[in-house]
Amino acid sequence: MLNNINTFAKTNLCHVFSASLIPSLQTNVMQRYEAFHFNGKIITDSFRLSQQLHHLGYCKKRYYYIQHYEWMNTQVLPYTIIKNTLLHPSVELIVQSQDQVELIEQLSNKKVKYVMNNWDLNILSQIADE
């Protein structure tokens, strides 16, 4: 993942929002709360953080990158959480593999926007060019 993001950042403007510094990243690393003022396209692969995507008022596009089904680890999953992540109209869905497409589309009643394996450079470029 880090290698792909570093390669992508060489030719595209790229920011990473993180709770801590990531020394091996060769791009802008900012604290997570800075995402609330970010006016570009934002992708998160964290289910917890995806719940905040609809609150990011300045974002041009919001993507939830589903690599794993994190929500299955919760004991109780209120509908409002699903509504604010998988079902929210301003959040586009990206999945890790083609095997996930049917399940996620049935669960969310939305089309999966991209299939992106491990932060694939070609898909990141397509998203940047949208």
Which residues does each PLM region occupy?
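Membrane-proximal helix-turn-helix segments that form the acceptor-binding/catalytic region
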Residues: 30-37, 76-93
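A short, active-site helix/loop in glycosyltransferases that binds the activated sugar's phosphate group
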Residues: 52-53, 90-114
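N-terminal pre-catalytic "stem/leader" segment of glycosyltransferase-like enzymes
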Residues: 1-38, 107, 124-130
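Active-site proximal beta-strand in glycosyltransferases
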Residues: 41-43, 56-73
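Short hydrophobic/aromatic-enriched beta-strand-loop microsegments
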Residues: 61-67, 111-118
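Short N-terminal targeting/anchoring amphipathic segment
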Residues: 32-50
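Short, polar loop motifs at secondary-structure junctions
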Residues: 17-22, 45-51, 96-102
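Short beta-strand->alpha-helix junction loop in the catalytic core
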Residues: 69-71, 115-126
